[in-house]
Amino acid sequence: MAATMAVTTMVTRSKESWSSLQVPAVAFPWKPRGGKTGGLEFPRRAMFASVGLNVCPGVPAGRDPREPDPKVVRAADNCDIAASLAPPFPGSRPPGRRGRGSEEEEAEGRRHEEAAAAGRSEPEEGQGQDRQPAPARLVSGAIAGAVSRTFVAPLETIRTHLMVGSIGVDSMAGVFQWIMQNEGWTGLFRGNAVNVLRVAPSKAIEHFTYDTAKKFLTPKGDEPPKIPIPTPLVAGALAGFASTLCTYPMELIKTRVTIEKDVYDNVAHAFVKILRDEGPSELYRGLTPSLIGVVPYAACNFYAYETLKRLYRRATGRRPGADVGPVATLLIGSAAGAIASSATFPLEVARKQMQVGAVGGRQVYQNVLHAIYCILKKEGAGGLYRGLGPSCIKLMPAAGIAFMCYEACKKILVDKEDEEEEDEAGGGEDDKKKVE
């Protein structure tokens, strides 16, 4: 039959018009060219590919004769090329979809129809359909920062008083007793509102920057390392730099309101008074030592967190990137905060001293090295670690709660596949070797 069709095709070239040929219930993979007579348009490489196309008068009119009978299994030949190059048959399935099951095609068709009816485009494969990672990570970081700082606000107040020596008491119990006698329990939360306003966006920017930098710096598959040092260190440093640069004025105002309660009535009054009396540049006084203190702390904090989490997975036999649970996250985050705080505390002391400035007749420091030198000269090495105990007591739960809240919010707001992919990306080379 295929040979007969080929002969028929060549004979009809001498006809006035190919369209005058009427063959009932037959569809051909070629057509008249541009409406001209005596010419046919054949798909390239398909001149002799009609064998196996099942072109015969017995093919039902409702089905494309180029499509194979599902009951007949045949080997692939040039007919597939002809069918893919030929114009589509009305009502037939598009090329490339013929090998899929009918149920899958119907489901996909319904999905396309629903998307078209709703006026939206289909998401590409691998993309989340209902979750946006960037806003979700920002919200998760903000919630984590607000919750963690509110829980440890009293410890933050006590730590700040001990670091700057504003009330002449050298113990946590003494500072707590003095605050309760002179200010009441509200004194423990003095400056907490501005602290939350500062920490919430700071943590949002910090965690978002860290996740973005870690994902960018982590090699994919068998790629060589992009940087010669651990990725969490660099990503953490970038996160600390970005968050500090954006939120430093709020940090300075919070410190002033906490220490100089007789000078400033509230946050707004402190902001206006600083701008009026000292100028806008005063809002960034101590930025350099702040960056020197915060950037190493963030780098150490994230690196310690990733390292401890990887060691915990290995000790408990969990796969790389697996969830470690809220309790383990709280403990690991607390330990990471203690390690980072101990390593960078002298820089934190110098930063606080420079932020206070000349208020209350205190000494003005030219730079962070000058501050450290003066503290060493006046108080010795112990002066650089004044308040380390309460600092760790405050930072340990703060870091643990922040990491726990952030991971919990990510599970709710961020696509699970995207979260697991980034978790595995931060697992380190040891996890990759273990999987292999």
Curated annotation (Swiss-Prot):
Acidic residues bias: start-end ranges: 417-428
Lineage: Eukaryota, Viridiplantae, Streptophyta, Embryophyta, Tracheophyta
Phenotype on disruption: Severely reduced starch content of endosperm resulting in kernels with a collapsed angular appearance at maturity.
Notes on how activity is controlled: Inhibited by mersalyl.
Alphabetical UniProt keywords: Amyloplast, Chloroplast, Membrane, Mitochondrion, Mitochondrion inner membrane, Plastid, Plastid inner membrane, Repeat, Transit peptide, Transmembrane, Transmembrane helix, Transport
Residues covered by region (Disordered): 83-135, 417-436
Location (main, coarse): plastid
Protein name: Adenine nucleotide transporter BT1, chloroplastic/amyloplastic/mitochondrial
Biological role stated in the UniProt entry: Probable adenylate translocator that mediates transport of ADP-glucose into endosperm storage plastids during starch synthesis. Transports cytosolic ADP-glucose to amyloplast stroma by counter-exchange with ADP.
UniProt cross-references to InterPro entries, sorted A to Z: Mit_carrier, Mitochondrial_sb/sol_carrier, Mt_carrier_dom_sf
GO cellular component, one term: amyloplast inner membrane
Organ and tissue specificity: Highly expressed in silks and endosperm of developing kernels. Expressed at intermediate levels in tassels and lower levels in stems and leaves.
Organism: Zea mays (Maize)
